[in-house]
């Protein structure tokens, strides 16, 4: 038995080499498209398998299971689910601007519904798909062995139209990603023709033709032209996109808003669900209802709460809170013709495509020229055979080795003799000299044209230009599939803040929050609290007088702020609803609840003895998850959030030391841990109080208010330890019992 050889290598080097190999495989063979045909390997193999199955646009459909089986069996040794998902996407009219596959059956929907199983669906290629593989049989591209060396597959497709930009691409590799939106083919062809006529054209020239993305789902791009051009100049950027909507007048002066197009890759069902949740949470008070009346076309009906609402303001509030407005990324990271992945700008992508087409036309012309030369050689031999027909037939009949004799006797080449010998005697007898002469003459004319194309770059570029214009004619703006779907509009209302409180009647309310976190609101102020009932084991914790138009700040023990509209708090005399249904407070306690007042200073303090001042406008949260303002270490909590309505602060902790200092010693911050308020050793800060020094320090002791005017003994600098509190101070070391 042969002894095993064990080689010691560095683990780090081995790991890096293998990870690099994996990364390269992911980038080159899976995730990034080729700039020339806009396809990834799985797309290329799928379409080539359909070509081999002769699934032309005018042929019958075949089961998708048959197609997928051929792909994974011959070319792509991966899971059938991944291949079928690819096939489905190439057939979805809402995913691809120019679908490459014509599907029959259930291929999913814009609601996010899955396609039917591959055994039920059928497919064939679309007309534009055939343009990707036109002339592939004419030696226009290289082929390589398949994974098991049993067949050949194309390295690249001839691609007679710029599929990368026309249909876009998405992919996530290792350390890099690509995100290219679809574009209008007519505009791309215009840009390519201009680039052929003006090889030194710049990016700005291209942008005169390419206005921006053109999505299969339509929509409106609301960015300025300068921002769009800047994105294409670098190959990186993003586009803001909005749904298309219109106002429908109804009877009695009412109206409804109808959304007819939604942003690309937004699932309609999830969009409706998103709006419904906002309605339930009372986050969009301008809207009363939404319903889906879509058929083959999208029709989302939004009903305003009041007919006096400006529909533009209603939609602005929805754009701000929902995916009716979304951002589309641009990252043109592709594999170049040199097999190196990099980010290209729009000009470089177009130049790479034209270079590819130049190479395709050159290789096709060379192939056709060689075929013509081969045929001309054969025709010369057939003409000689016609002139010496009887003698040639005699040689064929009588000689055992007629090939050598014919080559020597008539000065024929081996190719010519093979052609004569492979022709039936009956066909030889039917040869007519005029037919041979005519075919020979026609082929010589074609030969001259092809030689001119190969020898004269101008003629070659004329052919490239002619073929691009042919594509433009077939799929241009005047066709159903070619008409631009996405429009452009510079929106000035995007940054407008919609004040939803303007649509709420201002009424006094009293907000009640219990110790167990149940919150409710009662009409009016000065409410009789004795009539309020709580759940068993629960009791009051916060009582706040506010108005329905107020915004309420909720501070959690982890230092996170939440914002609620007072009108959204449960109304009535029941036990209310859990605060956890309104905000994502988790298992944290509520430190305080207070009414938001613009530009008011708030003092935050934690049990570790630190704190800072923060402007109330900085703590406003826009989402249910809140906004982290005070960073609290593990094992500690945010113990206080108080409005600053005095000039001094008093601190007391577990050490039973009282410290008083000027509020001006505390800095104003936007977020963080803050500065040390009181110094402790193995103790925590328990309570703070803000007061005016000249009024004295007061505290509550078993229902009695006590006042200490002489506080000189407790004055100190911020960060000091303090001194024992005055006689009669409550034993719980807090300013309220």
Curated annotation (Swiss-Prot):
Q: How does it sit in the membrane?
A: Peripheral membrane protein
What domain of life is recorded for the organism? Answer: Bacteria
The question of whether tRNA processing is a record keyword is answered with: no
What's the chief localization of this chain? membrane
Cellular compartments per GO CC: chromosome; cytoplasm; DNA topoisomerase type II (double strand cut, ATP-hydrolyzing) complex; extrinsic component of plasma membrane
Check the record and name the InterPro entries matching this protein. Answer: GyrA/parC_rep, Gyrase/topoIV_suA_C, Topo_IIA-like_dom_sf, Topo_IIA_A/C_ab, Topo_IIA_A_a_sf, Topo_IIA_dom_A, TopoIV_A_Gneg, Type_II_DNA_Topoisomerases
**Subcellular location, in the record's words?**
Cell membrane
- The site annotation (Interaction with DNA) covers 40, 76, 78
Indicate the segments forming the Topo IIA-type catalytic domain, all copies: 32-496
What does the sequence similarity comment in the record state about its family?
Belongs to the type II topoisomerase GyrA/ParC subunit family. ParC type 1 subfamily.
PANTHER family hit by this protein: DNA GYRASE/TOPOISOMERASE SUBUNIT A (PTHR43493), DNA TOPOISOMERASE 4 SUBUNIT A (PTHR43493:SF1)
Q: How does this protein assemble?
A: Heterotetramer composed of ParC and ParE.
Recorded hits in HAMAP family, A to Z, give: ParC_type1
Q: How is this protein named in the record?
A: DNA topoisomerase 4 subunit A
Query: Organism source for this protein?
Result: Rickettsia felis (strain ATCC VR-1525 / URRWXCal2) (Rickettsia azadi)
List the gene name: parC
